[in-house]
């Protein structure tokens, strides 16, 4: 985790790698900031088992699961995948202990189409971004209209649709369900319901502009970054961290509030009209 980042919740840092606690990848910092934004009054554990390249040892995962058990956590976020398919009895015992104690485990599917060993356990909640022609599984929760703008190292932001960064979105839904007294046994069923699938699977539509004055103001301010073409369509190739961070500054300036991580997804960015209308909706 990048400890220069402000958090609203208490965090305990534990490191099971051969590297320092410093996050040089960005992955861990992003996940923690997304989970931290869910609510105040939470107690977070940042257990580092992946190195700067995003790789880790199975032995580190086992020790981390044991640490989570001993720390009496409620939810374990595993934004990682295991591509080996030889059954590991020690890992299975640890996972079973966690699940039997009522700990909710959330993981993500592979970004390259490979099967995640963890998601083969039907008691573990797995999430994946919905894409065209994707072969779906009844054991996976799909979220449409990814990517979205998410926090990164330092005070920067990126546009990403990686599955890892969808787990906090599901954990937020789990938190809300638990607050509404939904039982752990019924959590997955509720999450699978269409009402919890983010947005629709329809083609993104260009909206009609609502506030022409706001449109003109924003268009002038963002023209320097070349994020939209002459038809006001979003240019994904220009979505560099620098440009996305600048876009967040515009959002914060216009709305007079800190950027909310669940607020700007691809449908809100696809056309300049959509972007302006989304800012306008926050202003109202």
What feature does the model see in each segment?
Residues 56-77, 88-103, 113-128, 132-142:
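Mature extracellular/periplasmic domains of secretome proteins
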Residues 5, 108, 114-179:
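Extracellular S/T/G-rich loop segment that most often corresponds to the catalytic His/Ser-adjacent loop
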Residues 18-83:
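Subtilisin-like peptidase catalytic core
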Residues 1-16:
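Acidic-leg catalytic submotif of subtilisin-like serine proteases
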Residues 192-284:
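Phosphopantetheine-dependent thiolation modules in NRPS/PKS and related acyl-activating systems
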Residues 30-33, 168-175, 246:
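Short amphipathic alpha-helical face segments that pack within enzyme cores
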């Amino acid at each position: 985790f990048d400890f220069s980042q402000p958090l609203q919740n208490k965090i305990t840092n534990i490191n099971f790698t051969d590297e320092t606690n410093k996050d040089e990848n960005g992955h861990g910092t992003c996940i923690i900031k997304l989970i931290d934004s869910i609510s105040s009054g939470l107690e977070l554990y940042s257990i580092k088992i992946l190195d700067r390249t995003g790789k880790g040892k199975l032995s580190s995962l086992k020790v981390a699961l044991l640490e989570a058990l001993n720390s009496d956590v409620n939810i374990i976020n595993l934004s990682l995948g295991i591509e080996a398919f030889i059954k590991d009895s020690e890992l299975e015992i640890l996972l079973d202990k966690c699940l039997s104690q009522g700990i909710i485990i959330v993981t993500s599917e592979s970004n390259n189409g490979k099967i995640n060993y963890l998601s083969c356990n039907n008691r573990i909640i797995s999430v994946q971004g919905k894409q065209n022609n994707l072969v779906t599984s009844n054991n996976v929760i799909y979220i449409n209209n990814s990517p979205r703008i998410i926090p990164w190292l330092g005070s920067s932001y990126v546009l990403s649709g990686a599955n890892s960064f969808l787990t906090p979105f599901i954990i937020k839904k789990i938190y809300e369900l638990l607050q509404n007294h939904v039982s752990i046994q019924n959590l997955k069923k509720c999450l699978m319901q269409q009402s919890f699938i983010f947005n629709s699977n329809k083609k993104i539509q260009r909206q009609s502009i609502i506030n022409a004055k706001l449109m003109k103001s924003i268009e002038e301010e963002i023209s320097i970054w070349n994020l939209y073409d002459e038809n006001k369509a979003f240019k994904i190739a220009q979505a560099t961290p620098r440009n996305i961070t600048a876009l967040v500054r515009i959002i914060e300036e216009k709305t007079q509030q800190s950027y909310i991580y669940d607020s700007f997804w691809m449908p809100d960015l696809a056309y300049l009209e959509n972007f302006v209308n989304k800012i306008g909706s926050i202003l109202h």
